[in-house]
UniProtKB/Swiss-Prot annotation:
Gene3D superfamilies to which the protein is assigned, alphabetical: 3.40.50.2020
Presence of keyword GTP-binding: yes
Name used for this protein in its record: Uracil phosphoribosyltransferase
Organism taxonomic ancestry: Bacteria, Pseudomonadati, Pseudomonadota, Gammaproteobacteria, Enterobacterales
CDD domains assigned to the protein according to its UniProt record, in alphabetical order: PRTases_typeI
Comment on bound cofactor: Binds 1 Mg(2+) ion per subunit. The magnesium is bound as Mg-PRPP.
Biological source species: Blochmanniella pennsylvanica (strain BPEN)
Protein's gene: upp
Main function: Catalyzes the conversion of uracil and 5-phospho-alpha-D-ribose 1-diphosphate (PRPP) to UMP and diphosphate.
Alphabetized PANTHER family for the sequence: ADENINE PHOSPHORIBOSYLTRANSFERASE, URACIL PHOSPHORIBOSYLTRANSFERASE, CHLOROPLASTIC
Regulation of protein activity: Allosterically activated by GTP.
HAMAP family: Upp_B (MF_01218_B)
Coiled-coil blocks: none
InterPro entries per record: PRibTrfase_dom, PRTase-like, Upp_B, UPRTase/APRTase, Ura_phspho_trans
Keywords: Allosteric enzyme, Glycosyltransferase, GTP-binding, Magnesium, Nucleotide-binding, Transferase
UniProt-listed GO biological process terms: UMP salvage; uracil salvage
Amino acid sequence: MKIVEIKHPLVRHKLGLMRICDISTKRFRELSSELGSLLTYVATDDLEVEIVTIKGWCGLVKIARIKGKKITVVPILRAGLGMMNGVLEHLPSARISIIGIYRNEITFEPIPYFHKLVSNINERMAMVLDPMLATGGSIIATIDLLKKFGCNNIKVLSIVAAPEGIKALEEKHPDIELYLASIDQKINKNGYIIPGFGDAGDKTFGTK
């Protein structure tokens, strides 16, 4: 599995701000979007481009254009929504597929409850968004569903991840690509990433 931990100073700075205990909902939401944007910049580095000729202000000009790449952005409800706008800044024409999964707080097992996928998803590259890769259960379940519908070109964008979750993901889906801002220390007995930044869904939506 391709794993890319982005250590750019801007990424490290913004992630540090997200870890502040009493960060406001507004600021956490802004930073989630900004990191989604920065992760997308790196994750799309291998998109093919073609040279086309357009009419510019001074006549005909040759420009580069992304070559026929169909993309679907797949935020995992609900925390993945916080990253979505930042991703769409770079990919404004991407179609959006929604997958809803919640975690059983006792067993930590993922429980899918909703999905709405774009048409012809088997022809698209999917960019899965989830700010936290803890046990890996939700992301694994999402990829299972995407592959069930024939989508095998998958990239995962997470902000923080635990080594345990990365290992589980790699064992189940070694063919995907993972882009993240930080590989943190571990997950605790409650299934949260340490140091992490707490519950990303609650911090994004202002809930408890």
